[in-house]
């Protein structure tokens, strides 16, 4: 996914980006 979880947490991988969000 992307290095910035707040960049596109809903657009990219939810299991890798917004995991922490």
Curated annotation (Swiss-Prot):
GO terms for cellular component: apoplast. Its main location: secreted. Keywords: Apoplast, Cell wall, Secreted. It is found in: Secreted, Extracellular space, Apoplast; Secreted, Cell wall. It comes from the Eukaryota. Homotetramer. May subsume the role of germin at the low water potentials during embryogenesis. Belongs to the germin family. This is Pseudogermin. It comes from Triticum aestivum (Wheat).
């Amino acid at each position: 996914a992307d290095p910035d979880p707040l960049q596109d947490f809903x657009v990219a991988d939810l299991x890798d980006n917004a995991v922490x969000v």
